[in-house]
Amino acid sequence: NLIMLDEALIYNSHHFFGLTSVFNPDAVSDVEIYKGSYPVNYGGRISSVMHIRHRDGNNERFSLSGGLGLITSRLLLEGPIQKNKSSYLISGRSTFWDFLTRGAKNPTISGYRANYRDFNAKFNFDINQNNKLFFSGYAGQDENKLGLDLLRKWGNDVFSMRLNHIHNAKLFSNFTAYLSNYSYRVIEEDDKASFVGTSRITDYALKSDFNYFRNPEHIYNFGASVTFHRLAPGKRIPGVSSTNNEVDLGSEHAVESYAYFSNEIKLSSKVTMTSGLRFSQFSLLGPSDVYLYTPGVTKTINAIVDTISYAPRENIKTFFNVHPRVTLKYQLTETSALKVNYSSLVQYMHRLSNTITPSSSDIWKASGK
């Protein structure tokens, strides 16, 4: 699934193994969901799309709200920076289960941890009549330890900046830059076998989106984006007293870009047709070592026959795809519609899930040779 927060990619969308969303409902303005076919401005995943947007803070007066719960406590502040021109919204949530379990006499219970915390922030500025600037941020982390088991920590950090510009009465644009980071850590605290295992993926992206309203029944949408992916799939660092060896799977670097154009036209009061093309490109870059194996046998260390070494930023493999999409919608009622569509989708980043533990210990892998 493609999950986004204020135009930025989110790699992990839940707390408590899926029981709670990472998105604080107090800070959410709207949610856009597509199942199956979706517009050409979305891509990179082949399932569904969910785009969440922060709401703007109150630009007229300060307000404070919050609540205490058995699972989660929350707090939200919002108010004007400059009245009627700029505002802020800051919210946070946290659990306090550690305070309930640390006093237990049973070491299995006292060592139990199942906590999470997250913070949301949005600042918006009306620069002038034609320009608005938005800054959005999210930081969240889960921490889990079952008795004498390993301590696991994981979380997202996201920051985005967006400029909304009105060119004229018919043309609008959004320019966005964002940073998205997802990390996972597992910690063994036993002295003889202590270690810290880490996994991380970081994205740096620039994107632009344009909307041209030819008339109320005819809209053109077009834009482009480029994303730099840095993946560190796994590293294990032994403790001082540990007899284990350090293991490092290295890192991967990739550049993903796309451009799109779509045409939405209202054929009648109830029938709308949307057609478009999306052009995508993905390049896996060095530094990296690519192993060649004996054909027809299982890929093991003993089956390696040669190694190709690539220098930093050297191209290892490039993919290019064109994705046509067509949707015909018939509006049955105000709340229901019938859709027929054709979509071509592609996914270059792949998630390797761990089915043994319920924690979010997913590892991401880039397409390559």
Predicted regions and their residues:
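Signature of Gram-negative outer-membrane beta-barrel scaffolds
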Residues: 221, 226-332, 348
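Short acidic/polar hinge/loop motifs at secondary-structure boundaries
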Residues: 8-34
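Hydrophobic, lipid-facing positions within transmembrane beta-strands of outer-membrane proteins
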Residues: 46-48, 62-64, 71-75, 117-121, ...
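Transmembrane beta-strands of outer-membrane beta-barrel pores
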Residues: 35, 54, 70-72, 81-83, ...
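Transmembrane beta-barrel wall of Gram-negative outer-membrane proteins
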Residues: 69-94, 107-143, 152-173, 179, ...
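Outer-membrane beta-barrel strand-turn architecture
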Residues: 56-58, 81-83, 125-129, 165-171, ...
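Outer-membrane beta-barrel signature, preferentially recognizing the C-terminal barrel domain
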Residues: 152-154, 158, 162-166, 207, ...
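N-terminal periplasmic accessory domains that precede
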Residues: 18-21, 33-36, 41-64, 75
